Amino acid sequence: MEEERRLRGRLSRRRPPAGGGPPNCRPWFLSEESKSEPWAALLRSTVGGNTDWTPNSQPLPPLPAFPSQESLPDPESTVPPEVFTVGSKTFSWTPFPPALRGSGSSCRLLRCPEGSPGSPAPSLKGCPALDSRQTPSTQECVQSQLVLLNCPLCQKAFDPKLTQLDVDSHLAQCLAESTEDVVW
């Protein structure tokens, strides 16, 4: 048993420094041998002249709020969930936030049937205008009858005479054959 202890070695506590005062706890990046290391130089520049690392130092002030958190209200608290019933079950659904103005990525893919299909910027006079603070209900979306101009996966142009079932069938087939992740 003693032989095992001798082979393992002994662990001992560090002795306090002579003089009885608190130990000199200088951070590693303030030591003389770390002057040339880039991380030490970066840390030294952030510390500046304040090298007081004792726990008795005053606490730091809280960080300021992020600018976008102050100006925007919480979207989840402003939009009430929609409730719908299918058969005997009732479901609640929280609608997506309204699209940001200036994000015209979906404008190129959708058009109203009244718009001219050959124009580069389709006319939306038959579609209801969306208020940026209001999400359209499901009934409004069905009544607006937006039509997909082309497939977002293969970019095939859809004939205006195609039914919604034909478009959905093509999208399902294209999505099934796709190996890429698509964000809708």
From Swiss-Prot:
Biased amino acid composition, Polar residues: 47-57
Tagged with keyword Ubl conjugation: no
ZnF region ranges: UBZ2-type: 148-184
A GO cellular-component term linked to this record: Fanconi anaemia nuclear complex
Modified residues (Phosphoserine): 119
Ranges for region Disordered: 1-30, 46-81
InterPro entries named in the record: FA_core_complex_assoc, FANCA_interact, UBZ2_FAAP20
Highest taxon of the lineage: Eukaryota
Annotated Zn(2+) binding sites: 151, 154, 170, 174
Keywords: Chromosome, DNA damage, DNA repair, Metal-binding, Nucleus, Phosphoprotein, Zinc, Zinc-finger
Comp. bias intervals (Basic residues): 7-16
Comment field on protein domains: The UBZ2-type zinc finger binds both 'Lys-48'- and 'Lys-63'-linked polyubiquitin with preference for 'Lys-63'-linked polyubiquitin.
Name listed for the protein in its UniProt record: Fanconi anemia core complex-associated protein 20
Organism: Rattus norvegicus (Rat)
